Amino acid sequence: NEYLAIRDAKQMGPVFHYLGMTVGIGVSENPAKKLKVAQKQRIYQSDIVYTTHSALGFDYLEENLATSKSKKFLPKFYFCLVDEVDAALLDSAQMPLIISGSPRVQSNLFVTCDEFVKTLKEGEDFNLDSTRTSVWLTRKGVKEAEIYFRVQNVYDPNNHQLIRQINLALRANHLFEKDRKYTVENGEVKLMDEATGRLLEGNKLQSGLHQALEARERVKISLETRSMASITYQNLFKMFPKLAGMTGTGRVCKDEFREVYGLGVVVVPTRKPNQRIDYPDEIYLTIPQKLYASLEYIKALHSKGQPVLIATGSVGMSEIYSMLLLREGIAHNVLNAHNAAKEAEMIAQAGRRCAVTVATSMAGRGTDIILEKGVAELGGLAVVGTERMASERVDLQLRGRAGRQGAPGLSKFFVSLEDDLITKSGSKWINDYYQREIAKPEEKQKTRLTSFRIKYEVEEAQKNSDNSGAASRRSTEQYDESIRIQRQIIYSKRNKIIAHPDFTLDYFLSVLSDAMDDYTKKNPFKEQADLYRFVLDNISYYCEDIPASLDVTDLQQVKKFLSSLIITEYQKKKDRIQDPEMFDQFQRIVVLRAVDDCWVEQVDYLQQFQSLVISQGYAQKNPVFEFHKEAFESYK
């Protein structure tokens, strides 16, 4: 984050200055003020630049919207060193950085489709896949939609917008869990980082999904914007010939680092022996049983003065634990997405005697909890996990809050078969076992589950979840490959236009000839009104009447007429501007704007198409192949 980039640059800057190197800070020290181009040019000329992954990504996108050399500031990428590298390269890998442009025409179907989707029943009208990452209408659901919206065929091309909105409403209602994937603050839907529980300020879901979530929550629906430029963190960091990083949890994902980024993982031994005790999980049948057992354990630790960090998987669960602790009269702090501003202050107090801190997994990374004098003798910090997280790395980060720098500490996780991890990623066996047990009278139910098979199934559920996350990241990489190649070509062409503008009248006439050939293949002129419309849209708003003798079906005649029109308009502009240097600049900006407009259309179309084509996997088609095929055709 910005705070750490600024802190580290100021701490290490004097060392690098002493060694004869310059240091720049790529983020603004005043959040209210954005860095200007001149400032960025000075910063990026430094030998070493401290910045954040989002600041670097947006700088890259902004530079590639520049219209002159004077507005460019980035050097050629060479070496990048990433702190908390698994968070940046894996957890954030699928998150696209997007510069939004003008809003698209807003659909009035968001609320209507949300109301329709809320009437549907799972298993009858729609189905979810086993990992609850895809949702689709059944035949009965399709029939319900046709009755509800009074259409004969919901998949008719004329109903494209309707089926798109229904699919968005399905995803918003059934794939996005409130207080885990997003939350509502001050009448706004705000996204959350599932791995850390932190709010992703300024981030929005694309392709209408954010507006569908707003419709679900009945808050004001924001404008759906078009993407002017976008890039994923995966592709941003892959542009560096040399890439490295550090993290406390790299070993468990070493295979993915090698497959995706070609990076090996080296384990560095700890400076001091690890004294933390990691106790086995306690597994229970239901969430209430788990809550009671974990609360008793926390009370026992608190009674002897040992500081406790309670790690929850969602904002909702952190608030439940807070309520239970209040009922027991235990003073505590709550750290979640709703009060992240107080994070540093709360973490600073978490190592004090008798301190109890309830936190989402946001407390698991980049925060040192300093033990108060005398706390080490009590056993150090105790980390109590209230569920196994979706990734083993998050569990390890949470355990790692205790036992820092050779200090004592302990960690223990409490799990139930009703936890999200088990219900979404657990095997059929463990879910069947739960159904059998829960069907028994309460007095005959097993409460604490100690069998080796149950423990094994919990571990397997987490492995399944990790594998699902890795597969999802690989899928994102596959889809993004076409956009990556096209982006490189477009940005390379832009740079050539900026560096060597060499435009002549002949160049524009050749562009016209190619454009005419492409246009008339799809939209042959049938009458003079068609040609007149083409002129108004593409050449000039000031067009005299088209000669009555002109045969608009004869392409050569039309080209001759339009060429003369372009020569006239070109000369008018040249006479008006007069200064040759200014005229060159005018031509460059015209061409860049034309390239940018086409690229915006392409990026926006591919994002819309990607969300649509994924559903073709259920139509016996390979969605990735279909996407690449269409991406190539639309680019041509």
Question: Whereabouts are the PLM-identified features?
Answer:
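Conserved P-loop NTPase motor core
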Residues: E2-E442, Y491-S492, L509
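Extended, charged helical/alpha-beta scaffold domains that provide interaction surfaces
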Residues: T183, G187-K190, R198-N203, Q405-G406, ...
